[in-house]
């Protein structure tokens, strides 16, 4: 029988492996994306690096578990064979996978089987909701544009939100979900504010809207982070005759050197949403060295095309290479043991009996 020290040593050796791994690219519509899309590029670059890949369309995907062989497989709709997900497999999640609860439940299944993902379900749910992101970052004291929720289209609700931002125009109106600059409107008058809110709620009465302080700037910055490490940053210049600076809307991008304070704040934001591979967007302060930037949002599925052009290096290849180091693979913690109710000196109590029988890992106390 092996000693405890031998077991621990073996675990460390496994973690330090840097040979090719197995990769599942789980995306909303991988069949329809262009060849310049990040999902396609990940698959293409991974194969050149010797990484075995499986491109999985989340709509219709399902997981099977063979209890006898202890094998987990993920399947595209109509694919009976599927793809085996073992301890050497990681899942990269791309796109807006929050459209249906079943999509998120599939991610939870993957996590429960101990398969690591580039971002957790928790991270994705926070990042896909702009107000939830705002609240999470507010909890850790991040500098952000002042933001309020407009719960409905009543004049009172709109006025309250307007007053909370000191009645100063212009303001920015945003839907809680949406990316690439979609669902973001610059509001310059009170009349425009009420009409836009009414229009949005007429189209979808169950939507949620944010009103946000407008920060004057000619550009914003996208910083890409993998495992608490900044792998690239780009300056996105404001589009002509538009206040937005999204590269997907035509904004010109270029390399930018971040200050140490900006780096610290971006890393803090990524950690705040529990993100491992994320893009952090911010507007620099007037004094970039001494003043914290305004954090705008954190993107769990940041694109690769614009940032690769800005830093003149393929960021998908950089990310794939970083994950060769198994030490950065992060699995969601699993509860082990069972809760039991018992009586001590006439009083009923609930305690946790940790036998190790309800988990695939060993717990030591």
Where do the model's predicted regions map?
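C-terminal active-site "lid" helix and adjoining low-complexity regulatory extension at the edge
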Residues: 4, 10-13, 257, 271, ...
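Phosphate-binding site of ATP-dependent enzymes
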Residues: 182-269
């Amino acid at each position: 029988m092996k000693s405890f020290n031998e077991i621990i040593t073996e675990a460390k050796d496994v973690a330090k492996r840097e040979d090719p791994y197995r990769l599942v690219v789980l995306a909303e519509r991988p069949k329809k994306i262009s060849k310049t899309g990040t999902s396609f590029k990940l698959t293409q670059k991974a194969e050149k690096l010797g990484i075995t890949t499986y491109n999985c369309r989340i709509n219709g995907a399902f997981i099977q578990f063979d209890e006898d062989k202890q094998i987990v497989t993920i399947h595209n709709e109509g694919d009976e064979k599927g793809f085996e997900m073992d301890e050497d497999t990681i899942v990269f999640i791309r796109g807006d996978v929050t459209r249906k609860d079943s999509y998120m439940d599939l991610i939870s299944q993957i996590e429960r089987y101990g398969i690591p993902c580039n971002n957790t379900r928790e991270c994705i749910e926070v990042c896909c909701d702009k107000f939830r992101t705002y609240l999470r970052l507010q909890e850790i004291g991040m500098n952000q544009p002042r933001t309020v929720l407009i719960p409905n289209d009543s004049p009172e609700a709109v006025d309250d939100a307007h007053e909370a931002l000191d009645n100063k125009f212009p303001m920015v109106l945003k839907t809680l979900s949406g990316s690439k600059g979609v669902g973001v409107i610059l509001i310059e008058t009170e009349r425009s504010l009420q009409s836009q809110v009414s229009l949005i709620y007429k189209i979808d009465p169950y939507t949620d809207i944010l009103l946000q302080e407008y920060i004057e700037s000619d550009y914003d910055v996208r910083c890409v982070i993998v495992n608490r490490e900044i792998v690239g940053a780009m300056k996105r210049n404001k589009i002509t005759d538009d206040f937005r600076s999204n590269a997907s809307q035509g904004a010109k991008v270029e390399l930018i050197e971040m200050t140490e304070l900006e780096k610290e704040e971006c890393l803090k934001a990524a950690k705040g949403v529990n993100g491992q591979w994320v893009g952090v967007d911010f507007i620099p302060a007037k004094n970039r060295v001494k003043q914290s930037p305004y954090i705008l949002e954190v993107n769990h599925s940041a694109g690769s095309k614009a940032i690769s052009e800005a830093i003149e290096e393929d960021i998908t290849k950089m990310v794939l290479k970083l994950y060769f180091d198994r030490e950065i693979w992060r699995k969601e913690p699993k509860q082990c043991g069972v809760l039991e109710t018992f009586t001590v000196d006439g009083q009923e109590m609930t305690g946790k009996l940790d036998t190790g029988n309800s988990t695939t890992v060993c717990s030591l106390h």
